[in-house]
Amino acid sequence: MRKQRSPWTKKQQFIFGIIEIVVTLIASLTAILIVATKPYVDAEKKVIAIAESKADIKTVTEFDIYHGEATYYGLLGKSGQGEKLAVIVSHDSGEVDIYKQSDGISKSVAKKAAKAYGAKDISYVHLGKYGKTPIWEVKSGTQYYLVDFISGQVIKVEGL
């Protein structure tokens, strides 16, 4: 009786096994990433379409989701006439508020206002609404600084 030899050596089988595991991991992580970001991407597309129809937005420069007392989508962009606009859309009601960026403060001014109240390392700044007031939400550590978009005043500090 002859002993049949495997066409693959143990070393080759090991390398092939490692390659299979790596490819499976990469495919799995890619699928998870796509599924995890789908709600964000869908919301962004929906809000951009609303902004294009209601505010004549032609170029979008920024998109944010603000989760406060209610969820709002904030969008910065330029209209067909080149005017810089801020658009805030309510997740619940679909209400659309349109502001000229020149009528409000910039993101950097909102950061400065929050720093004046003690914010240190700022993680992000999102456009949203607090009640009827358009705001910038500035996150620093465990604190959230709500800065009035129009006046630049800090209207509320939340967090631990």
Predicted regions and their residues:
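Short, non-transmembrane alpha-helical segments in secretory-pathway proteins
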Residues: 30-63, 97-130
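Residue-identity detector for threonine
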Residues: 9, 24, 30, 37, ...
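Hydrophobic membrane-insertion alpha-helices, especially the h-region
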Residues: 15-32
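Hydrophobic alpha-helical segments and their boundary regions
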Residues: 6, 16-17, 141
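N-terminal Lys/Arg-rich, disordered targeting/topogenic segments
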Residues: 1-9
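Conserved histidines in hydrophobic membrane contexts and catalytic metal-binding motifs
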Residues: 51, 68-94, 108-160
